[in-house]
Amino acid sequence: MKRDANTWNEILIQCRVKPFTAANWAAVFAQEIGADTFSKGESEIDDFLGQILHESALLEKMEEGLYYKTPGRLMAVWPSRFASLADELPYLRNPEALANKVYGGRMGNVRAGDGWRYRGGGLIQVTGADNYRALQQSTGLPVYEKPELMRQPGAVCLRAAIAWWERNIPDSIMGDTTRVTRRVNGGVIGLADRMALTDEANRALA
């Protein structure tokens, strides 16, 4: 079934998305998602929505949060990178410097500033120049050349999430939110909310 923007606006609102945000995204969802978008068709859309809505804080956040201000927090998150409070000081309240510190020199980030340039972005986050490049090569989306597109509401961001989903989530686990979450998250962080959002999406799509 191909849903129009008004229908998608209502679906997103029923899934707890703020009305202003839903209005900004509705036409994009209407354009990009139809009955044949996913390999399992309509039955897969609720699983997809449940995950991307949780991952993006209900379509409000498409960028990795790298603003830290509490001493000791960086040591807890990246213990191999920060051995002392003194090590942390230049990177507190300095997300660009932090991204270059923790991501520079790996994941294909070889140029100065690549850690920040290719920080986590997207409805399902992609991190690192190698992963942005691979996504561009597999989809044709210009996300390696213009990584900022992954951090902005729009068709590129949604298409990238769909492409990642189709490559990484096998049809055999659809409907099993716990197993799907492990694929998306690497664990089960936020599982209860993901389950609730998947159920809400299922009802809204009916």
Please identify what each model-predicted range represents:
Residues Q14-D46:
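N-terminal carbohydrate-binding/catalytic regions of secreted carbohydrate-active enzymes
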Residues A27, Q31, D46-L49, R159, ...:
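Solvent-exposed, polar/charged alpha-helical surfaces in well-ordered, non-transmembrane soluble domains
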Residues E42-A57:
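Active-site-adjacent structural elements in enzyme catalytic domains
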Residues K2-N24, L53-A160:
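Peptidoglycan-targeting cell-wall enzymes and recognition modules
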Residues S172, R183-A206:
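Low-complexity, Gly/Ser/Thr/Pro-rich intrinsically disordered linker/tail segments
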Residues I52-E55, G128, M174-G190:
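Acidic helix/loop microenvironments that form the catalytic cleft of cell-wall polysaccharide enzymes
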Residues D4, S39-E44, W116-R119, G175-D176:
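Extracellular/periplasmic catalytic domains that process cell-envelope and extracellular macromolecules
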Residues A155-L158, R167-D171:
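Proteins synthesized as precursors that undergo proteolytic processing into mature forms
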